[in-house]
Amino acid sequence: MRVQQSGGTSASTARSNTLPLLLGLIFLAAFGLGYLAQQQHWGEALAAGVQAWARSPKTALTAWRARQQLPTLTVDLRFADYERLSSARERALQQGMYVPLPEEAVTARVTFADARGQVAAELRLPGGAAQGAADAGWTLELRPAGARAWRRLTPVVDAALAWRQWGYLETLRRNGFAAATLEPVRLIVNGSSWGLYLLETPATEALTVGFDARAAWQALAEGEVLADGGFRYAAPAVSAADDPAAPAAWATLDAAFEGERALSSVTDAEALGRFVALTMLWTGAPAPDWASLRWSYDPATGQLAPLGSAQPADIAPLPEAFFDDPAVQTAIARALVAYSQPGFLETLRGEFGADLEAQGYALGGATQPGGDPWQVLTAHQRAMRARVAPEHPLRAMLEPAGEDFVLRLTSLQPFPLEVTGLDVGGVTRRALDPAWVRSQDRALLLKAENALVLRAMDGELPQTVELLLPREALAPGGELTLFCRVWDADAPEGRVAVLETLPLFEETP
Protein backbone atom coordinates (compact mmCIF):
# COMPACT_ATOMS: atom_id res chain seq x y z
CA MET A 1 0.00 0.00 0.00
CA ARG A 2 1.35 3.43 -0.91
CA VAL A 3 0.51 6.51 1.11
CA GLN A 4 0.85 9.86 -0.61
CA GLN A 5 1.07 13.17 1.17
CA SER A 6 -1.62 15.50 -0.10
CA GLY A 7 -0.85 19.08 -0.77
CA GLY A 8 -4.56 20.05 -0.57
CA THR A 9 -8.07 18.70 -0.15
CA SER A 10 -8.87 16.15 -2.82
CA ALA A 11 -12.20 16.01 -4.63
CA SER A 12 -13.05 12.66 -3.01
CA THR A 13 -12.36 14.07 0.45
CA ALA A 14 -14.55 17.07 -0.24
CA ARG A 15 -17.33 14.79 -1.43
CA SER A 16 -17.04 12.61 1.70
CA ASN A 17 -17.18 15.68 3.94
CA THR A 18 -20.18 17.05 2.09
CA LEU A 19 -22.18 13.82 2.11
CA PRO A 20 -23.30 13.97 5.80
CA LEU A 21 -24.37 17.58 5.31
CA LEU A 22 -26.39 16.69 2.22
CA LEU A 23 -28.01 13.77 4.02
CA GLY A 24 -28.86 16.07 6.89
CA LEU A 25 -30.42 18.64 4.58
CA ILE A 26 -32.40 15.94 2.79
CA PHE A 27 -33.60 14.53 6.10
CA LEU A 28 -34.62 17.93 7.46
CA ALA A 29 -36.39 18.81 4.23
CA ALA A 30 -38.32 15.55 4.23
CA PHE A 31 -39.02 15.85 7.92
CA GLY A 32 -40.23 19.41 7.59
CA LEU A 33 -42.35 18.82 4.50
CA GLY A 34 -43.94 15.77 6.08
CA TYR A 35 -44.94 17.69 9.14
CA LEU A 36 -46.00 20.75 7.19
CA ALA A 37 -48.38 18.53 5.28
CA GLN A 38 -49.57 16.23 8.03
CA GLN A 39 -48.79 17.41 11.54
CA GLN A 40 -50.93 19.79 13.57
CA HIS A 41 -48.04 21.36 15.49
CA TRP A 42 -45.53 21.16 12.69
CA GLY A 43 -43.41 24.05 13.94
CA GLU A 44 -42.65 22.39 17.26
CA ALA A 45 -42.07 19.05 15.57
CA LEU A 46 -39.67 20.57 13.06
CA ALA A 47 -37.71 22.27 15.85
CA ALA A 48 -37.53 18.98 17.72
CA GLY A 49 -36.31 17.27 14.55
CA VAL A 50 -33.52 19.82 14.12
CA GLN A 51 -32.43 19.34 17.73
CA ALA A 52 -32.52 15.56 17.36
CA TRP A 53 -30.40 15.75 14.21
CA ALA A 54 -27.88 17.96 15.98
CA ARG A 55 -27.52 15.44 18.81
CA SER A 56 -27.24 12.33 16.65
CA PRO A 57 -27.85 12.35 12.88
CA LYS A 58 -27.86 8.56 12.66
CA THR A 59 -30.39 8.14 15.47
CA ALA A 60 -32.65 10.87 14.10
CA LEU A 61 -32.61 9.33 10.62
CA THR A 62 -33.39 5.87 12.01
CA ALA A 63 -36.31 7.29 14.01
CA TRP A 64 -37.65 9.12 10.97
CA ARG A 65 -37.52 5.95 8.88
CA ALA A 66 -39.29 4.01 11.64
CA ARG A 67 -42.12 6.54 11.73
CA GLN A 68 -42.58 6.44 7.97
CA GLN A 69 -43.27 2.71 8.23
CA LEU A 70 -46.04 3.10 10.82
CA PRO A 71 -49.57 2.15 9.75
CA THR A 72 -52.25 4.79 9.27
CA LEU A 73 -55.65 4.75 10.94
CA THR A 74 -58.31 6.92 9.35
CA VAL A 75 -61.47 8.18 11.07
CA ASP A 76 -64.26 9.98 9.22
CA LEU A 77 -67.28 11.44 10.98
CA ARG A 78 -69.94 14.02 10.33
CA PHE A 79 -69.25 17.62 11.25
CA ALA A 80 -72.15 17.66 13.73
CA ASP A 81 -70.75 14.60 15.50
CA TYR A 82 -67.30 16.16 15.56
CA GLU A 83 -68.79 19.27 17.17
CA ARG A 84 -70.57 17.13 19.75
CA LEU A 85 -67.29 15.49 20.75
CA SER A 86 -65.55 18.85 20.76
CA SER A 87 -68.17 20.34 23.10
CA ALA A 88 -67.89 17.36 25.45
CA ARG A 89 -64.11 17.70 25.53
CA GLU A 90 -64.28 21.43 26.22
CA ARG A 91 -66.59 20.75 29.15
CA ALA A 92 -64.25 18.03 30.42
CA LEU A 93 -61.25 20.37 30.27
CA GLN A 94 -63.14 22.97 32.28
CA GLN A 95 -64.08 20.43 34.96
CA GLY A 96 -60.79 18.54 34.79
CA MET A 97 -62.78 15.31 34.52
CA TYR A 98 -65.06 13.58 32.04
CA VAL A 99 -67.96 11.30 32.92
CA PRO A 100 -69.07 9.40 29.79
CA LEU A 101 -72.73 9.57 28.82
CA PRO A 102 -74.20 6.99 26.41
CA GLU A 103 -75.83 9.70 24.29
CA GLU A 104 -72.49 11.44 23.69
CA ALA A 105 -71.05 8.54 21.69
CA VAL A 106 -71.13 9.22 17.94
CA THR A 107 -70.87 7.09 14.82
CA ALA A 108 -67.89 7.15 12.49
CA ARG A 109 -66.28 5.30 9.62
CA VAL A 110 -62.91 3.84 10.49
CA THR A 111 -60.23 2.39 8.23
CA PHE A 112 -57.70 0.19 10.00
CA ALA A 113 -54.33 -0.51 8.47
CA ASP A 114 -55.10 -4.25 8.32
CA ALA A 115 -58.68 -3.93 7.03
CA ARG A 116 -60.08 -3.54 3.53
CA GLY A 117 -62.39 -0.58 3.23
CA GLN A 118 -64.14 1.24 6.01
CA VAL A 119 -66.00 -0.22 8.97
CA ALA A 120 -68.68 1.43 11.08
CA ALA A 121 -67.69 2.23 14.65
CA GLU A 122 -68.79 4.11 17.73
CA LEU A 123 -66.55 6.95 18.88
CA ARG A 124 -66.43 8.62 22.29
CA LEU A 125 -64.20 10.37 24.79
CA PRO A 126 -62.83 8.14 27.57
CA GLY A 127 -63.88 8.71 31.15
CA GLY A 128 -61.47 10.05 33.73
CA ALA A 129 -59.12 12.97 34.09
CA ALA A 130 -59.09 15.38 31.13
CA GLN A 131 -55.52 15.69 29.89
CA GLY A 132 -53.75 18.42 27.94
CA ALA A 133 -54.65 21.85 26.69
CA ALA A 134 -57.57 22.77 24.46
CA ASP A 135 -55.44 22.56 21.31
CA ALA A 136 -53.63 19.34 22.30
CA GLY A 137 -54.34 15.89 20.90
CA TRP A 138 -57.56 14.17 21.90
CA THR A 139 -57.74 10.80 23.58
CA LEU A 140 -60.53 8.77 21.96
CA GLU A 141 -62.19 5.39 22.31
CA LEU A 142 -63.68 3.49 19.39
CA ARG A 143 -65.66 0.30 19.10
CA PRO A 144 -66.11 -1.32 15.69
CA ALA A 145 -69.58 -2.60 14.87
CA GLY A 146 -70.15 -6.03 16.39
CA ALA A 147 -67.29 -5.74 18.89
CA ARG A 148 -67.73 -5.79 22.66
CA ALA A 149 -64.57 -4.05 23.76
CA TRP A 150 -63.58 -0.44 23.25
CA ARG A 151 -60.18 0.37 21.77
CA ARG A 152 -58.34 3.45 22.93
CA LEU A 153 -56.43 6.02 20.88
CA THR A 154 -53.95 8.04 22.94
CA PRO A 155 -51.75 10.81 21.51
CA VAL A 156 -48.04 10.30 22.08
CA VAL A 157 -47.21 13.38 24.11
CA ASP A 158 -44.57 11.79 26.34
CA ALA A 159 -42.47 9.37 24.28
CA ALA A 160 -40.75 7.95 27.37
CA LEU A 161 -44.10 7.17 29.00
CA ALA A 162 -45.36 5.55 25.79
CA TRP A 163 -42.19 3.46 25.63
CA ARG A 164 -42.74 2.23 29.20
CA GLN A 165 -46.39 1.45 28.48
CA TRP A 166 -45.39 -0.69 25.51
CA GLY A 167 -42.62 -2.38 27.48
CA TYR A 168 -44.95 -3.05 30.41
CA LEU A 169 -47.52 -4.86 28.30
CA GLU A 170 -44.88 -6.83 26.42
CA THR A 171 -43.24 -7.88 29.71
CA LEU A 172 -46.59 -9.07 31.05
CA ARG A 173 -47.15 -11.18 27.93
CA ARG A 174 -43.70 -12.72 28.17
CA ASN A 175 -44.45 -13.65 31.79
CA GLY A 176 -47.66 -15.49 31.00
CA PHE A 177 -50.30 -12.77 31.38
CA ALA A 178 -52.90 -11.75 28.84
CA ALA A 179 -52.34 -8.10 27.98
CA ALA A 180 -53.57 -5.48 25.56
CA THR A 181 -51.61 -4.75 22.39
CA LEU A 182 -50.25 -1.26 21.92
CA GLU A 183 -49.56 -0.21 18.34
CA PRO A 184 -48.15 3.15 17.20
CA VAL A 185 -50.24 4.55 14.34
CA ARG A 186 -50.56 7.77 12.40
CA LEU A 187 -54.08 9.05 12.98
CA ILE A 188 -56.02 10.95 10.33
CA VAL A 189 -59.40 12.46 11.26
CA ASN A 190 -61.58 13.86 8.46
CA GLY A 191 -58.55 14.14 6.21
CA SER A 192 -56.40 16.02 8.74
CA SER A 193 -53.38 14.41 10.37
CA TRP A 194 -53.52 14.29 14.15
CA GLY A 195 -50.02 12.92 14.44
CA LEU A 196 -48.66 9.91 16.30
CA TYR A 197 -51.06 7.88 18.44
CA LEU A 198 -51.07 4.61 20.34
CA LEU A 199 -53.90 2.23 19.49
CA GLU A 200 -54.64 0.02 22.48
CA THR A 201 -56.61 -3.14 21.76
CA PRO A 202 -57.79 -5.06 24.86
CA ALA A 203 -56.47 -8.54 25.50
CA THR A 204 -59.83 -10.21 24.97
CA GLU A 205 -63.31 -9.62 23.61
CA ALA A 206 -64.68 -12.18 26.09
CA LEU A 207 -66.40 -11.37 29.36
CA THR A 208 -64.35 -9.26 31.76
CA VAL A 209 -65.04 -7.80 35.18
CA GLY A 210 -63.63 -4.70 36.81
CA PHE A 211 -64.67 -1.60 38.72
CA ASP A 212 -67.13 1.00 37.51
CA ALA A 213 -65.46 4.38 38.09
CA ARG A 214 -68.24 6.71 36.96
CA ALA A 215 -69.32 7.63 40.50
CA ALA A 216 -65.71 8.47 41.37
CA TRP A 217 -65.30 10.59 38.25
CA GLN A 218 -68.51 12.44 39.05
CA ALA A 219 -67.32 13.18 42.59
CA LEU A 220 -63.98 14.44 41.29
CA ALA A 221 -65.74 16.58 38.67
CA GLU A 222 -67.76 18.16 41.48
CA GLY A 223 -64.56 19.11 43.28
CA GLU A 224 -64.41 16.39 45.91
CA VAL A 225 -60.88 15.61 47.11
CA LEU A 226 -60.32 11.86 47.13
CA ALA A 227 -57.07 10.69 48.69
CA ASP A 228 -57.74 7.12 47.55
CA GLY A 229 -58.13 8.14 43.92
CA GLY A 230 -61.87 7.58 44.16
CA PHE A 231 -61.74 3.89 45.08
CA ARG A 232 -64.32 4.48 47.82
CA TYR A 233 -66.82 4.90 44.99
CA ALA A 234 -65.73 1.76 43.13
CA ALA A 235 -68.39 -0.79 42.27
CA PRO A 236 -67.86 -4.16 40.54
CA ALA A 237 -69.14 -4.25 36.96
CA VAL A 238 -69.08 -6.67 34.03
CA SER A 239 -68.31 -5.88 30.41
CA ALA A 240 -71.36 -7.70 29.03
CA ALA A 241 -74.43 -8.04 31.23
CA ASP A 242 -76.08 -10.41 28.72
CA ASP A 243 -73.30 -13.00 29.01
CA PRO A 244 -74.54 -16.14 30.83
CA ALA A 245 -71.47 -16.06 33.10
CA ALA A 246 -71.87 -12.37 33.98
CA PRO A 247 -73.71 -12.86 37.31
CA ALA A 248 -71.10 -15.33 38.57
CA ALA A 249 -68.21 -13.12 37.45
CA TRP A 250 -69.74 -10.10 39.17
CA ALA A 251 -70.40 -12.05 42.37
CA THR A 252 -66.83 -13.37 42.47
CA LEU A 253 -65.20 -9.94 42.33
CA ASP A 254 -67.81 -8.47 44.65
CA ALA A 255 -67.14 -11.14 47.29
CA ALA A 256 -63.42 -10.34 47.28
CA PHE A 257 -64.13 -6.59 47.20
CA GLU A 258 -66.43 -6.78 50.23
CA GLY A 259 -64.07 -9.07 52.16
CA GLU A 260 -66.49 -11.99 52.10
CA ARG A 261 -63.89 -14.16 50.38
CA ALA A 262 -60.11 -14.06 50.57
CA LEU A 263 -58.56 -12.62 47.43
CA SER A 264 -56.39 -15.74 47.11
CA SER A 265 -59.56 -17.85 46.88
CA VAL A 266 -60.72 -16.12 43.69
CA THR A 267 -57.37 -15.65 41.91
CA ASP A 268 -53.89 -17.18 41.83
CA ALA A 269 -51.97 -15.38 44.59
CA GLU A 270 -48.52 -16.02 43.11
CA ALA A 271 -49.59 -14.82 39.66
CA LEU A 272 -51.19 -11.70 41.12
CA GLY A 273 -48.00 -11.02 43.07
CA ARG A 274 -45.94 -11.13 39.87
CA PHE A 275 -48.48 -8.92 38.09
CA VAL A 276 -48.31 -6.26 40.81
CA ALA A 277 -44.51 -6.35 40.97
CA LEU A 278 -44.14 -6.00 37.19
CA THR A 279 -46.53 -3.05 37.35
CA MET A 280 -44.29 -1.33 39.88
CA LEU A 281 -41.21 -2.08 37.79
CA TRP A 282 -42.60 -0.28 34.74
CA THR A 283 -44.73 2.43 36.38
CA GLY A 284 -43.22 3.05 39.81
CA ALA A 285 -46.71 2.69 41.34
CA PRO A 286 -47.27 0.02 44.02
CA ALA A 287 -50.32 -1.44 42.24
CA PRO A 288 -52.24 -1.20 38.95
CA ASP A 289 -54.67 1.62 38.28
CA TRP A 290 -57.96 0.52 39.84
CA ALA A 291 -60.24 2.19 37.29
CA SER A 292 -58.61 0.56 34.25
CA LEU A 293 -57.80 -2.88 35.70
CA ARG A 294 -59.89 -5.69 34.23
CA TRP A 295 -60.03 -9.38 35.10
CA SER A 296 -60.93 -12.33 32.91
CA TYR A 297 -63.33 -14.87 34.38
CA ASP A 298 -63.18 -18.63 33.86
CA PRO A 299 -66.66 -20.15 34.39
CA ALA A 300 -65.15 -23.64 34.69
CA THR A 301 -62.98 -22.76 37.70
CA GLY A 302 -64.70 -19.64 39.00
CA GLN A 303 -61.32 -17.90 39.02
CA LEU A 304 -60.28 -14.38 38.03
CA ALA A 305 -57.04 -13.46 36.26
CA PRO A 306 -55.70 -9.89 35.89
CA LEU A 307 -55.46 -8.46 32.37
CA GLY A 308 -52.72 -6.04 31.39
CA SER A 309 -53.66 -2.59 30.11
CA ALA A 310 -51.69 0.59 29.48
CA GLN A 311 -51.31 2.42 32.77
CA PRO A 312 -52.18 6.14 32.73
CA ALA A 313 -49.74 8.85 33.72
CA ASP A 314 -52.03 9.85 36.61
CA ILE A 315 -52.31 6.30 37.90
CA ALA A 316 -54.59 5.73 40.92
CA PRO A 317 -53.27 2.47 42.41
CA LEU A 318 -55.48 -0.13 44.00
CA PRO A 319 -55.30 0.61 47.74
CA GLU A 320 -53.40 -1.74 50.02
CA ALA A 321 -56.64 -2.72 51.75
CA PHE A 322 -57.70 -4.54 48.56
CA PHE A 323 -54.74 -6.91 49.04
CA ASP A 324 -55.63 -7.70 52.68
CA ASP A 325 -54.79 -11.37 52.33
CA PRO A 326 -51.50 -12.74 53.74
CA ALA A 327 -51.10 -15.18 50.85
CA VAL A 328 -51.35 -12.34 48.31
CA GLN A 329 -49.23 -9.95 50.38
CA THR A 330 -46.35 -12.40 50.72
CA ALA A 331 -46.60 -13.28 47.01
CA ILE A 332 -46.26 -9.59 46.13
CA ALA A 333 -43.26 -9.26 48.46
CA ARG A 334 -41.51 -12.28 46.91
CA ALA A 335 -42.07 -10.93 43.41
CA LEU A 336 -40.82 -7.46 44.39
CA VAL A 337 -37.61 -9.03 45.67
CA ALA A 338 -37.16 -11.14 42.52
CA TYR A 339 -37.90 -8.42 39.96
CA SER A 340 -35.90 -5.74 41.74
CA GLN A 341 -32.61 -7.55 41.16
CA PRO A 342 -30.29 -5.93 38.58
CA GLY A 343 -30.06 -9.23 36.74
CA PHE A 344 -33.75 -9.09 35.87
CA LEU A 345 -33.27 -5.96 33.77
CA GLU A 346 -30.40 -7.64 31.99
CA THR A 347 -32.73 -10.54 31.24
CA LEU A 348 -35.27 -8.14 29.75
CA ARG A 349 -32.59 -6.51 27.62
CA GLY A 350 -31.52 -9.90 26.33
CA GLU A 351 -35.04 -11.13 25.60
CA PHE A 352 -36.51 -8.15 23.78
CA GLY A 353 -34.15 -5.21 24.09
CA ALA A 354 -34.03 -4.90 20.30
CA ASP A 355 -37.82 -4.68 20.14
CA LEU A 356 -37.83 -2.01 22.83
CA GLU A 357 -35.18 -0.06 20.96
CA ALA A 358 -37.25 -0.23 17.77
CA GLN A 359 -40.30 1.07 19.63
CA GLY A 360 -38.18 3.86 21.07
CA TYR A 361 -37.31 4.97 17.55
CA ALA A 362 -40.91 4.77 16.35
CA LEU A 363 -42.23 6.69 19.35
CA GLY A 364 -39.58 9.38 19.09
CA GLY A 365 -38.04 8.75 22.49
CA ALA A 366 -34.69 7.85 20.98
CA THR A 367 -34.44 11.34 19.49
CA GLN A 368 -35.21 13.17 22.74
CA PRO A 369 -32.72 14.23 25.43
CA GLY A 370 -32.91 12.65 28.85
CA GLY A 371 -30.45 9.80 28.80
CA ASP A 372 -31.02 6.07 28.94
CA PRO A 373 -34.72 5.22 29.49
CA TRP A 374 -33.62 2.07 31.31
CA GLN A 375 -32.42 4.33 34.13
CA VAL A 376 -36.07 4.92 35.06
CA LEU A 377 -36.55 1.18 35.52
CA THR A 378 -33.40 1.05 37.65
CA ALA A 379 -34.88 3.77 39.86
CA HIS A 380 -38.11 1.81 40.11
CA GLN A 381 -36.13 -1.24 41.20
CA ARG A 382 -34.58 0.77 44.03
CA ALA A 383 -38.08 1.76 45.15
CA MET A 384 -39.16 -1.90 45.00
CA ARG A 385 -36.27 -2.96 47.22
CA ALA A 386 -37.05 -0.15 49.66
CA ARG A 387 -40.69 -1.27 49.80
CA VAL A 388 -39.73 -4.67 51.18
CA ALA A 389 -36.86 -3.32 53.32
CA PRO A 390 -37.84 0.14 54.60
CA GLU A 391 -35.88 2.11 57.18
CA HIS A 392 -38.78 2.03 59.65
CA PRO A 393 -40.67 -1.26 59.27
CA LEU A 394 -42.21 -1.11 62.75
CA ARG A 395 -42.43 0.84 66.00
CA ALA A 396 -41.27 -0.79 69.22
CA MET A 397 -41.74 0.59 72.74
CA LEU A 398 -40.91 -0.94 76.11
CA GLU A 399 -42.23 0.03 79.53
CA PRO A 400 -42.23 -1.55 82.99
CA ALA A 401 -45.20 -3.67 84.10
CA GLY A 402 -44.65 -4.73 87.69
CA GLU A 403 -41.74 -7.14 87.82
CA ASP A 404 -41.87 -7.64 84.06
CA PHE A 405 -41.99 -5.44 80.96
CA VAL A 406 -44.47 -4.78 78.17
CA LEU A 407 -43.12 -4.61 74.62
CA ARG A 408 -45.49 -2.93 72.16
CA LEU A 409 -44.94 -3.72 68.48
CA THR A 410 -46.72 -1.83 65.69
CA SER A 411 -46.12 -2.97 62.12
CA LEU A 412 -45.84 -0.21 59.50
CA GLN A 413 -45.52 -2.63 56.60
CA PRO A 414 -48.07 -3.62 53.92
CA PHE A 415 -46.67 -7.15 54.20
CA PRO A 416 -46.57 -9.67 57.08
CA LEU A 417 -43.49 -8.95 59.19
CA GLU A 418 -41.46 -11.53 61.08
CA VAL A 419 -39.70 -10.36 64.25
CA THR A 420 -36.59 -12.52 64.08
CA GLY A 421 -34.83 -11.56 67.28
CA LEU A 422 -34.04 -9.14 70.10
CA ASP A 423 -30.53 -7.90 70.75
CA VAL A 424 -29.81 -6.93 74.35
CA GLY A 425 -26.90 -4.57 74.88
CA GLY A 426 -25.03 -5.86 71.85
CA VAL A 427 -24.19 -8.99 73.82
CA THR A 428 -27.14 -11.34 73.60
CA ARG A 429 -29.56 -12.04 70.77
CA ARG A 430 -32.61 -14.08 71.59
CA ALA A 431 -35.87 -14.99 69.89
CA LEU A 432 -39.20 -13.61 71.03
CA ASP A 433 -41.50 -16.36 72.24
CA PRO A 434 -44.97 -16.10 70.61
CA ALA A 435 -46.35 -17.28 73.96
CA TRP A 436 -45.38 -13.88 75.43
CA VAL A 437 -48.05 -12.18 73.28
CA ARG A 438 -51.11 -11.16 75.27
CA SER A 439 -54.04 -13.42 74.54
CA GLN A 440 -56.26 -10.59 73.25
CA ASP A 441 -53.62 -9.67 70.63
CA ARG A 442 -52.91 -13.11 69.22
CA ALA A 443 -55.44 -12.62 66.43
CA LEU A 444 -53.07 -9.95 65.08
CA LEU A 445 -50.41 -12.61 64.47
CA LEU A 446 -50.11 -15.01 61.58
CA LYS A 447 -49.98 -18.66 62.47
CA ALA A 448 -46.36 -19.60 61.88
CA GLU A 449 -44.49 -22.41 63.56
CA ASN A 450 -41.79 -21.13 65.95
CA ALA A 451 -41.99 -17.61 64.52
CA LEU A 452 -43.50 -14.31 65.63
CA VAL A 453 -45.17 -12.85 62.54
CA LEU A 454 -47.16 -9.62 62.67
CA ARG A 455 -50.00 -9.13 60.22
CA ALA A 456 -49.64 -6.37 57.64
CA MET A 457 -50.76 -2.89 58.57
CA ASP A 458 -54.52 -2.61 58.13
CA GLY A 459 -54.84 0.28 55.70
CA GLU A 460 -53.90 3.50 57.46
CA LEU A 461 -54.76 2.12 60.93
CA PRO A 462 -51.69 0.45 62.47
CA GLN A 463 -52.45 -2.26 65.01
CA THR A 464 -50.33 -2.82 68.09
CA VAL A 465 -49.37 -6.17 69.57
CA GLU A 466 -48.32 -6.35 73.22
CA LEU A 467 -45.84 -8.88 74.59
CA LEU A 468 -45.25 -9.47 78.29
CA LEU A 469 -41.50 -10.00 78.63
CA PRO A 470 -40.04 -11.58 81.77
CA ARG A 471 -37.27 -9.55 83.37
CA GLU A 472 -34.66 -12.21 82.73
CA ALA A 473 -35.30 -11.95 78.97
CA LEU A 474 -33.70 -8.50 79.06
CA ALA A 475 -30.60 -9.46 81.00
CA PRO A 476 -27.84 -8.31 81.13
CA GLY A 477 -29.41 -4.95 80.16
CA GLY A 478 -28.39 -2.20 77.79
CA GLU A 479 -29.77 -0.89 74.53
CA LEU A 480 -32.41 -3.03 72.88
CA THR A 481 -32.59 -3.66 69.14
CA LEU A 482 -35.19 -5.68 67.28
CA PHE A 483 -34.47 -7.58 64.07
CA CYS A 484 -37.24 -8.10 61.54
CA ARG A 485 -37.90 -8.87 57.89
CA VAL A 486 -40.80 -9.43 55.53
CA TRP A 487 -42.25 -12.86 56.19
CA ASP A 488 -41.65 -15.70 53.74
CA ALA A 489 -39.68 -13.59 51.27
CA ASP A 490 -35.98 -13.39 50.58
CA ALA A 491 -35.87 -9.84 51.95
CA PRO A 492 -32.98 -8.41 53.98
CA GLU A 493 -33.20 -8.20 57.74
CA GLY A 494 -33.79 -4.78 59.27
CA ARG A 495 -32.89 -3.32 62.67
CA VAL A 496 -35.23 -1.26 64.85
CA ALA A 497 -34.22 0.49 68.07
CA VAL A 498 -36.62 -0.12 70.96
CA LEU A 499 -37.82 3.04 72.68
CA GLU A 500 -37.83 2.79 76.46
CA THR A 501 -40.19 4.84 78.61
CA LEU A 502 -37.91 4.29 81.63
CA PRO A 503 -34.35 2.97 82.01
CA LEU A 504 -34.46 -0.80 82.34
CA PHE A 505 -31.59 -1.25 84.70
CA GLU A 506 -29.43 1.13 86.61
CA GLU A 507 -25.96 1.28 85.20
CA THR A 508 -23.30 -0.12 87.47
CA PRO A 509 -19.93 1.59 87.69
Language model segments and positions:
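Regulatory N- and C-terminal appendages and interdomain linkers associated
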Residues: R2-A120, E346-P509
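Short, solvent-exposed loop/turn and secondary-structure capping segments
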Residues: S86-A88, Y197, T208-D212, P288-R294, ...
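Structural recognition of the beta-strand scaffold that forms the well-ordered cores
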Residues: A121, T139-E141, L153-V156, R186, ...
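Anionic ligand-binding catalytic core segments
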Residues: R124, A130-A133, G146-W150, D314-F323, ...
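Short, conserved helix/loop micro-motifs enriched in His/Cys and acidic residues
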Residues: A133-W166, P247-R261, A269
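A conserved helix-loop-beta module that forms one wall/lid of the active-site cleft
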Residues: A159-S192
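Internal "kinase-insert"/substrate-recognition segments embedded within catalytic cores
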Residues: F177-A180, S193-R274, L356
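Middle-to-C-terminal accessory/interaction subdomains
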Residues: P247-D289, L293-W295, G302-P416
